Regions:
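Short, surface-exposed loop or secondary-structure junction motifs
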Residues: 1-139
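Short, well-ordered loop/turn and helix-capping segments at boundaries between secondary-structure elements
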Residues: 28, 87, 150-154, 165-169, ...
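Short linear motifs in exposed loops
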Residues: 58-59, 132, 136, 148, ...
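Short, solvent-exposed loop/helix junctions and linker helices
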Residues: 71-75, 153, 185
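Peripheral terminal and inter-domain segments
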Residues: 119, 140, 157-267
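Short, well-ordered beta-strand elements
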Residues: 123-124, 134-151, 251-255
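Histidine- and/or cysteine-centered catalytic micro-motif in compact active-site loops
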Residues: 125, 149-152, 207, 216
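Extracytoplasmic and endomembrane cell-envelope/extracellular-matrix remodeling and assembly machinery
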Residues: 129, 146-150, 154-161
Length: 267
């Protein structure tokens, strides 16, 4: 919607506007709107986890994402973007303040704003078929961390926090290793049901020796047990943990992803 408004007001295509008003002024010479027709030098191929190991990812029409994504860039160019955005080149300081002010939760205008290990962090991740990314800025120390990956399932958020810890002179967290165990059908069945989170709901469906997570947007995710109450995704940095309520019933579900957690309740 915003991309369509931008085109109507400016009289330019979205690609023309972004190139003329953002990429060229900031010197982002290796960034643009993705195309599988044009030859883009040094373009990375995308991969995803398959049943027999890593596979070539599908190549969706980049026009589908339009102004919500479908851009290509480099770590150097994204550093230039952060310097331009937080240096007052892209937006006025008043607009930047509005953009980075959280509303109700830690989410501001397209950015997550919270404290991680005592450091103020302004961050957002991104993903597309075959690619994952994470971009974080620590305004108090003026530290930027950019992580780009051409493999779905890469824990870019965890990598960002580890690199930020090094930049802050701290010890980076040790990545967790998940080991699958077997649970009885009876144990898996007690977790079946619909769970309501603040902004979405999901269903837990027992399937074989794992649970199938069915999101309200139609997406699904298989999660495997590593303990009686803990489950993890093999390709994605997502874990779930079931907890009992005051009556001793498993009705509380906590979702962990990229260092953040959300708590939902069984309907």
């Amino acid at each position: 919607m915003l991309g369509c408004l931008l085109e109507r007001i400016s009289g330019q295509t979205y690609e023309e506007f972004v190139q003329e008003n953002i990429f060229k002024p900031l010197g982002m010479n290796d960034s643009g709107l993705m195309s599988f027709v044009s030859i883009i030098p040094r373009r990375a191929s995308g991969y995803w986890p398959g049943s027999n190991g890593t596979e070539n990812a599908d190549r969706p029409d980049p026009r589908v994402g339009f102004s919500s994504g479908s851009l290509y860039s480099t770590t150097e160019d994204l550093l230039r973007w952060e310097e331009g955005l937080f240096g007052g080149t892209v937006l006025s300081l008043a607009s930047l303040r509005k953009m980075t002010t959280p509303f109700k939760s830690d989410y501001a205008c397209g950015l997550h704003v919270n404290r991680v290990n005592g450091h103020l962090m302004i961050e957002h991740d991104g993903n597309n078929i075959g690619f994952n990314s994470d971009l974080a800025y620590y305004p108090e120390e003026r530290i930027t961390v950019v992580v780009l990956a051409n493999l779905n399932g890469t824990v870019t958020g965890e990598m960002t926090r580890a690199l930020a810890a090094v930049a802050h002179g701290e010890t980076p967290p040790i990545p967790s290793v998940h080991k699958e165990i077997s649970l009885s059908k009876e144990v898996l069945t007690r977790y079946a049901g619909t769970y309501q989170f603040p902004h979405y709901s999901l269903k837990m469906i027992p399937e074989g020796n794992h649970l199938l997570v069915e999101f309200d947007n139609g997406g699904t995710l298989a999660v495997f047990p590593e303990a009686d109450t803990k489950f993890f995704s093999k390709p994605w940095p997502t874990q779930f943990e079931f907890s009992k309520n005051e009556h001793g019933e498993f009705t509380i579900l906590t979702r962990y992803q990229d260092g953040a957690k959300e708590i939902g309740a069984k309907k």
